[in-house]
């Protein structure tokens, strides 16, 4: 590709370098090699304009900067654009050029990882070569890689989509985080459909209000999806109505799912210990589904996934039958084991108020004894959610143990105190390993334990150091000790 091939995205007309070969796209000056186009992005911690000279020294073909950036005196062309992040995403899409032919994205506060994984599984069972991209990484035929970002940066994303397409993947589902949408990471992805799960308090360290957070989510529907594309929206959330209105205003084909859904209507559900039996109406036909996952929220996630699969061509009967073979996403109400007396221990990623409320409420119907929870809140993040989560835990669980969960640069005792202020009767055990072992030791027949916060993650960040720590490993170790 030559620089002139990015015309329409970048102002390359008349540039001396227009006929030179582009060898790459980057927003990290350390990755610049001769022929790479460098994008100077303004970030929260650093401004890419400060690294433009370094990029030029490393051989950048051109530097792309915003109109407000002071980038001058470089020995390479400086291309000025209104929105450097948008230009980066669109340039990356054009540079890498290919993606799976059917792409869907799902947004919401909770459930994105599960919906992306479930949609992939439905497609797989329908016989399609499918992939999912999100918080737990990339899963595709012959590929299972862990990742740390919900929505990868545009260069990594479009490179990945090219690799998946080259490997024969034709269907792909991905998570669309509010950060990713706001920072234009998904722009340039050709989406066939979009999904919405729910909205609750999250990322208040990034978004000034919940309304601003919701507006960021809506970019999926009012900006990224083409007119007429399916928008599969869970209908039973307080934020469903404004999301439906926005999608309709954008000219999308709104398909609602859930108890109040029109496209897939949940008529009845019966909870069992590790599974649920549901009746779902679709196109006037009633389907009985035996979902091998616990929790109301998993029914909701499964319906959004089925809606995405059906709206992109999977037959209704095949999609709903596939729900009976779903496997939960790693760290999402993940049954790690049971005690000798049969008490189950789950690990869940719930680190937000709504997610904690959902997971605790979901195990109550099949718990004959006590619901117990071990959780904490992260440091250097939304401080306002700490007492909210403390209140939720004490309201919905019978035994609450407050512990540490990535305190980062904050004093751990201060974080715990903020939670405990709204959690009368909660037990404080700062050491997360000890907290898990103590909780497992307290279990009796009929009890259920949730270890919340980390899910699939395998680290505990204290200060600037991340130490290896796995809730799964600690639960298994505690269960072995008690069984000995």
Curated annotation (Swiss-Prot):
Residues engaged in binding ATP: 108-114
InterPro entries reported for this sequence: Mur-like_cat_sf (IPR036565), Mur_ligase_C (IPR004101), Mur_ligase_C_dom_sf (IPR036615), Mur_ligase_cen (IPR013221), Mur_ligase_N (IPR000713), MurE/MurF_N (IPR035911), UDP-N-AcMur-Glu-dNH2Pim_ligase (IPR005761)
Superkingdom classification of source: Bacteria
Positions of meso-2,6-diaminopimelate binding: 381, 405-408, 453, 457
Post-translational modification: Carboxylation is probably crucial for Mg(2+) binding and, consequently, for the gamma-phosphate positioning of ATP.
Example of a GO biological process term: cell division
Source organism: Mesorhizobium japonicum (strain LMG 29417 / CECT 9101 / MAFF 303099) (Mesorhizobium loti (strain MAFF 303099))
Chain sites annotated for binding UDP-N-acetyl-alpha-D-muramoyl-L-alanyl-D-glutamate: 29, 150-151, 177, 183, 185
Function summary: Catalyzes the addition of meso-diaminopimelic acid to the nucleotide precursor UDP-N-acetylmuramoyl-L-alanyl-D-glutamate (UMAG) in the biosynthesis of bacterial cell-wall peptidoglycan.
Modified residues annotated as N6-carboxylysine in this record: 217
Keyword terms, alphabetized: ATP-binding, Cell cycle, Cell division, Cell shape, Cell wall biogenesis/degradation, Cytoplasm, Ligase, Magnesium, Nucleotide-binding, Peptidoglycan synthesis
Keyword Cytoplasm: yes
Motif (Meso-diaminopimelate recognition motif): 405-408
Enzyme Commission designation: 6.3.2.13
Record carries keyword Cell cycle: yes
Pathway the protein acts in: Cell wall biogenesis; peptidoglycan biosynthesis
Subcellular location: Cytoplasm
Co-factor requirement: Mg(2+)
SUPFAM superfamilies reported in the protein's UniProt record: MurD-like peptide ligases, catalytic domain (SSF53623), MurD-like peptide ligases, peptide-binding domain (SSF53244), MurE/MurF N-terminal domain (SSF63418)
Family in the record: Belongs to the MurCDEF family. MurE subfamily.
Main localization, broad class: cytoplasm
Catalytic activity: UDP-N-acetyl-alpha-D-muramoyl-L-alanyl-D-glutamate + meso-2,6-diaminopimelate + ATP = UDP-N-acetyl-alpha-D-muramoyl-L-alanyl-gamma-D-glutamyl-meso-2,6-diaminopimelate + ADP + phosphate + H(+)
UniProt GO MF annotations: ATP binding; magnesium ion binding; UDP-N-acetylmuramoylalanyl-D-glutamate-2,6-diaminopimelate ligase activity
Pfam family, one: Mur_ligase_M
Record's signal peptide: none
Official protein name in the record: UDP-N-acetylmuramoyl-L-alanyl-D-glutamate--2,6-diaminopimelate ligase
NCBIfam families named in the record: murE (TIGR01085), PRK00139.1-2 (NF001124), PRK00139.1-4 (NF001126)
